[in-house]
């Protein structure tokens, strides 16, 4: 029996209940920036390249359905990066995320359109020290659908915080990515077990269509 099978057997009946979609979803596009998709860049992650390709269709459908779309990016203030606190000490590679650096620009295939909300953050969670939770509550949102990167970092942190803010949390498997499959799969397993539902893109799109009426 593999380690993955052993973990699933161990968790069965204790973790992994389904939460499902509520009545009003929002699509949260987390940190789809070119630093993750540019070969040779320090943050380059092939899994994110694949996620962008899949997320483009999900984003197009959400727009057609009138679903609220929120984009996040990471932005710091050079030269001292004081707004990055301890995180930029732990991960100095994040110092690329400054205004004007091409690596900090949105990936074109999933870039925000005029009128869509863009929130800049300095830490992993899209909810930490941002107006995201009040925005979603004000719009009556009860379900947060997550796409973006990286699975083991900002996706996981945002999924946990989404649940803690009272939202049904849905992570779209094909639309999130990481630099290696091991942390990607491990974190999807954890999220699906404890914090939300990990679903296929097909299932997510079907639910968005259904809820759009």
From Swiss-Prot:
UniProt keywords, alphabetically: Aromatic hydrocarbons catabolism, Hydrolase
Involved pathway(s): Cofactor degradation; nicotinate degradation
Upregulation: Repressed by NicR in the absence of 6-hydroxynicotinate (6HNA) inducer. In presence of 6HNA, repression is alleviated.
Protein family according to the UniProt entry: Belongs to the isochorismatase family.
Protein name: Maleamate amidohydrolase
InterPro entries xref list: Isochorismatase-like_dom, Isochorismatase-like_hydrls, Isochorismatase-like_sf
Active site: 154
Single GO MF annotation: hydrolase activity, acting on carbon-nitrogen (but not peptide) bonds, in linear amides
Function: Maleamate amidase that transforms maleamate into maleate and ammonia in the aerobic nicotinate degradation pathway.
Signal peptide residues on this chain, from the entry's feature table: none
């Amino acid at each position: 029996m593999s380690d993955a099978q052993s973990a699933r057997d161990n968790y069965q009946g204790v973790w992994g209940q389904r939460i499902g979609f509520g009545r009003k979803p929002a699509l949260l596009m987390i940190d789809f920036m070119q630093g993750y998709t540019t070969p040779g860049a320090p943050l380059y992650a092939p899994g994110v390249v694949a996620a962008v390709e899949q997320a483009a269709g999900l984003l197009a459908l959400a727009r057609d359905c009138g679903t609220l779309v929120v984009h996040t990016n990471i932005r710091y203030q050079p030269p001292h990066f004081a707004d990055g606190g301890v995180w930029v000490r732990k991960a100095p590679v994040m110092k690329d995320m400054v205004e004007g650096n091409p690596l900090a620009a949105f990936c074109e295939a999933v870039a925000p359109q005029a009128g869509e909300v863009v929130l800049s953050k300095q830490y992993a969670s899209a909810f930490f020290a941002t107006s995201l939770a009040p925005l979603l509550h004000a719009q009556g949102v009860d379900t947060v659908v997550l796409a973006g990167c990286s699975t083991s970092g900002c996706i996981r942190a945002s999924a946990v915080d989404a649940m803690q803010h009272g939202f049904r949390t849905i992570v779209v498997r094909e639309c999130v990515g990481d630099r290696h499959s091991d942390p990607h799969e491990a974190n999807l397993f954890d999220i699906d077990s404890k914090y939300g539902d990990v679903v296929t893109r097909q299932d997510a799109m079907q639910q968005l269509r259904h809820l759009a009426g």
